[in-house]
């Protein structure tokens, strides 16, 4: 008896659960149908509204030609046709202007460059590359800026002053002024020059004083001085002595007693000159590129 009641209760519970599931499924189905009906109603209402609007547009009366009011351009009350001022009217493009289609125009040049440049033309057509036009007007009376004009003027003045006082080394070599012919490379020919140099130096020392002898020698003209090469980076020139007859920015030209012309570099060289009772040692590095090497 007890087992029958248990089975009966389980069957009743199962039926109740199935009824609940069925009720939930019916509710979901009803909700979906309602949503679908609302969408259908909304679609039909939109179609009706569009149909009404098109019908109203067709039913509107078209304006007749007689109803359009013509505006007189001479009427002062019309703002759209107010006359322009005289300066503005002159600057407007004239209606009778004809554009030239002849060759050589800017348009033809641009097209020619585009078609000739190959890949660049394709890039230009695609908009990835822009074409820059350099349209310059060359003036007959070109006026330089103040800075460039003043700079060129100063340079020309400087060159003119230098050309008056001295010649460049390049011009000296080209003109042959630095070349001493072999028939003039005689020690005896330059002995009078040595005597003139001694008198010149003695007068110079009297004017400047013995205390400033070193400064005097640095600025003095040494052409005609009897010079002895005590040290030189070229071993064959060490011990050379004679009269100095030519000076450049980097060398001393010496005529020896055996009538030979030697060009001794100043750099890393030591020279000794005899002046009256003094023996003066000169370092060649101090005499490189002197401002007053030779006054010509």
From Swiss-Prot:
Basic residues bias (residue ranges): 163-173
Biased segments, Basic and acidic residues type: 36-56
InterPro entries: RNase_P/MRP_Rpp29-subunit (IPR016848), RNase_P/MRP_Rpp29_sf (IPR036980), Rof/RNase_P-like (IPR023534), Rpp29/RNP1 (IPR002730)
One GO term describing the cellular component: ribonuclease MRP complex
Sequence motif Nuclear localization signal, residues: 160-167
UniProt keyword list: Nucleus, rRNA processing
Subcellular compartments: Nucleus
Superkingdom of origin organism: Eukaryota
Compositionally biased tracts (Polar residues): 57-66
GO biological process: rRNA processing
Pfam families listed in its UniProt record: RNase_P-MRP_p29
Region (Disordered): 29-74, 148-173
Primary localisation category: nucleus
Disruption phenotype: Accumulation of unprocessed cytosolic rRNA precursors, especially the large 35S rRNA precursor, as well as of the internal transcribed spacer 1 (ITS1) fragment corresponding to the region between the 18S and 5.8S rRNAs that contains the A3 cleavage sites.
Quaternary structure, from the entry: Component of nuclear RNase MRP complexes. Several subunits of RNase P are also part of the RNase MRP complex. RNase MRP consists of a catalytic RNA moiety and several protein subunits.
PANTHER family tied to this protein: RIBONUCLEASE P PROTEIN SUBUNIT P29, RIBONUCLEASE P SUBUNIT P29
Sequence similarity: Belongs to the eukaryotic/archaeal RNase P protein component 1 family.
Free-text function comment from the UniProt entry: Component of the MRP ribonuclease complex, which cleaves pre-rRNA sequences. Required for rRNA maturation, including 5.8S rRNA processing. Seems not involved in tRNA maturation.
Protein name per Swiss-Prot or TrEMBL: Ribonuclease MRP protein subunit POP4
Species per Swiss-Prot/TrEMBL record: Arabidopsis thaliana
């Amino acid at each position: 008896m007890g087992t029958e009641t248990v089975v009966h209760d389980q069957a009743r519970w199962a039926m109740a659960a199935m009824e609940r599931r069925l009720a939930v499924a019916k509710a979901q189905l009803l909700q979906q149908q309602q949503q679908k009906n609302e969408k259908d109603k909304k679609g039909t209402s939109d179609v009706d509204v569009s149909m009404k609007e098109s019908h109203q547009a067709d039913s509107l009366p078209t304006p007749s030609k007689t109803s359009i009011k013509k505006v007189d351009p001479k009427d002062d009350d019309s703002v759209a046709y107010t006359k322009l001022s005289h300066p503005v009217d002159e600057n407007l493009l004239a209606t009778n202007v004809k554009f030239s289609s002849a060759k050589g125009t800017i348009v033809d040049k641009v097209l020619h460059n585009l078609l000739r440049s190959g890949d660049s033309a394709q890039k230009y057509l695609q908009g990835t590359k822009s074409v820059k036009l350099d349209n310059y007007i060359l003036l007959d009376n070109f006026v330089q800026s103040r800075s460039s004009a003043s700079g060129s003027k100063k340079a020309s003045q400087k060159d003119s002053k230098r050309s008056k006082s001295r010649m460049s080394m390049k011009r000296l070599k080209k003109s042959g002024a630095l070349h001493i012919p072999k028939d003039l490379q005689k020690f005896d020919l330059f002995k009078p020059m040595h005597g003139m140099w001694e008198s010149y130096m003695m007068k110079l020392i009297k004017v400047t004083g013995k205390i400033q002898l070193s400064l005097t020698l640095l600025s003095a003209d040494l052409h005609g001085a009897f010079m002895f090469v005590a040290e030189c980076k070229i071993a064959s020139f060490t011990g050379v002595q004679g009269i100095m007859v030519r000076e450049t920015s980097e060398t001393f030209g010496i005529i020896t007693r055996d009538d030979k012309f030697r060009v001794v570099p100043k750099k890393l060289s030591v020279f000794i000159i005899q002046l009256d009772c003094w023996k003066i040692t000169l370092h060649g590095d101090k005499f490189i590129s002197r401002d007053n090497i030779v006054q010509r």
